[in-house]
Structures are given as structure tokens and as C-alpha cells.
Amino acid sequence: RACGIIMNCNTGAVLAMATAPSFDLNNPSELKSSFDLQTLAEMKESGATEEELDAKEASLREQQWKNKAITELYYPGSVFKTVTCASALEEEVVSLNSTFHCAAYEMVAGTKIKCWSSYGHGTLTLQQAVTKSCNPSFIQIGQLLGKDKFCDYFEAFGFTEPTGIDLPGESGSLYVSRENMGLVELASSSFGQTNKVTPLQMTTALCAIVNGGYLVTPYVVDKMLDSDGNVVKTTETRIKRQVISEETSVQMRQILETVVNENGGSNAYINGYRIGGKSGTTEKIDEYNKLKAETGVDHMTYVPSFAAFAPADDPQIVMLVMADTPTGTQYYGSAVAAPVVSAVFKEGLPHLGIYPTYTAEELAKMDAAVPYVMGMEAQRAEAKLNAEGFEVRYVGDPASGATVSTQIPASGSSIPKGSTVVLYLGNEYDLESAVIPDVTGMTVSQANE
């Protein structure tokens, strides 16, 4: 299952919250998830009893009624690196000029903890460590911060208690206490792999990271009205505490905007908007260990996620999307969750009064509609296409005075500016059909040949 949350990061107002698959309010007992139905079908085929099937169906039904964003715990993974980074910057144990070294793993108290990159990242700046989401670098940052300070900030960012949202059934977190945290636990906690939190707790913490450092209480109900429509109660913003300084918050906004602008979160990039964010890809290590112990099966499952905020220079909203155990070939947060964030922001931000402002570079690369130039002489057609940002290639002699008989792509097609439009002059367009060869599995150069 997946869930998403959108919050006003300054007030705590929850603007949207959803879990999918959901259920039909008119028929809540009906299972809607195809995966749940498949599970029951497989159990039936394997010879499960009616009692076993009924018990499983009841369990699945109860699960689909849950609000995943507030009731279910998960390892936040690399999204949590935002917390570690902000804490370390606030304590001044790291700076933007700090460097770290990744040899593809880090040895901690005799335990080898691997980076996701089997080749290692080498020497990294703090910005590069966040952008490349390097685990060994964050282990080193966690060590510089130390157990006590790490636990102090873990608590200050709200992870040791429910957020206090005005919804029933909110869960608390499951975390390693200060007393039980050793070097290995600190190391894995630093990159979000040991402590389990709710998606809402992670969203609320990210709000504090980008809003100037203030931990706010999330809420759903904005106001209450009586039967005559009079306002009888209004929810006021509740600030629990300031966790980090405005200066640290500004640094974090800059770091996370760079993540989106570069390779780490490019799938969340939107032309005309300044977006900051961080991806996460969590190993469900507890389920892996249980499955291996009970069946001997060696199979890891994942929880991809992406957290983002906008606008990066003046944050108004924070969004978190997470997908629990996706079934496709992709399981990285940047590939699975980031495109969802991008799509929602692109459509939703204008409704909040946040409109795009395009840079010259973005304008130069944006898609544009190909104008109609059929019947025009070559020079006039080329001038019109150039004015719209397109290049031109002729089939035929442009000096012959012949007019454009065919244009490819056709007028009205939306293509990136800078693309080439092919103009066929006079009778140069060959209407004969041809068989398109099969280029499946070939490289681009092979296909072109």
C-alpha cells in the first residue's frame, strides 16, 4: 500500500492525506486491493480451510481501513538523512565545507555496513553526501554528532511521541533508546534504517527543517461551524518548540534544492518552480529476517519514498509520498515516489497561489507547439520556425522557390524547443510505405543505422 501527505509547513494544516488502495465507504467490507484478492485466491488454491480464509480476509479488511499515514510504522530510510544533516549543522560538528570518504562500506564496531554504491563514492562534500545519499558519509556524520546529541535531536524533532494530530488511532514510533544505543545502532540510525516512525512524524520533522526550525502540531480540522454556519471554533497554529535555527534551516533548504536540481531528485524537478527534496529507499529488514528464519527464503522488500517542499526559497508546503513494497521492477524512491510528487506539485501549486517563474534556460528547453508552415516558401517557413525556437532541415532545394509540401512533425505537435522540424519542398515527399525494422534490444546507435 502507499500513502501521501501534504502539509502547510508553517501552520501544520494538513491539506491532503491519502492511502491507496482505499475502500468504498458505501461498502467498506469489500476488499478493493487486487493483491489482497490474489492472496486469498492463492491461499484457497493451496488448501487453506474456511476458518483460515475467513481470518485472513478479516485481517486484510481491517488493514484496508487503516490510515497508513498515521497508524503504520516504517523505516524512513534516506529521507531521515535530512534530520541527521540538520542536527549536525546546528551543532556545528559539520559545515558545508566538511568532507567525508566512502569506500563502499564503513566498519563500525566490527560490523561492515555497506553503501548502496558497490564502487564507493570516494571523497564527498556535505552537499555531495546528501545528493548521492551516501550511507558511509552519514555514518561518519552520526559519529561526529554522537549518541547523546543524536538522541536529543531525535526527540526534539518529535519522533519519540505521536504528533498530536486531531485524528484517532495515531501510532507512536518504535526506536532504540538512548540507553540501548550502541555504535552500530547509531550508525544505522544516522541514515534512517533502525528506528521506525509514522509517515506523519517524518513529514512534521521535515516541516521543521525547512520552515525556520519550528516543530508544529499537524491538524485536519481548520474550523468548526454551528448549524447556522457560524464559526464556533478555529484551530490555531501550535508551535511545540524551535529545534534548529533559521540559519541552519536556510542551509538545509539550499542543500535539498540542489538535490532536486541535480541527479538525486531530478524526477521531482518542475520547470518554473524551486523544489527541494530527498529520496529514500528502505530495506524492510525485520520482515526479511523473519521470512528467512521461517522459510529459508532470501528475499528483501523495500519501501521507496520521496519528501519535498516548495517553493525552496520560501517554503509553504511539504509533501511525503511512500509506497510499501512496490511490485514493479523499480523500487528506488527517486524512481517510484518522486514522479508522484512532481505530478501533484505541478497541478496543485497553482491552486495554492504558487505560480511558476521560468528561467531563461528553462524557457529555452520547454516544449512548444510546432506552427503550421505548409504552402510557405522555404525562407518564410524557416523564419517562422526559428522564431518559435525550432531548427529546420530541408528535403529539397530551398533556393528553388518551391513551397513546403509536408512538415514533420505535423503542426500542433508539442516538442522541445531546439528540436529540428523537417520540411519537404515541392514533390520531394515520398508517399511510398516502408516496413519499419524491429530495433528492440538495440543500442541507440545500432537503431539509427
Locate each region found by the language model.
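Ligand-recognition elements built from short beta-strands and adjacent flexible loops
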Residues: T235, G272, D286, P311, ...
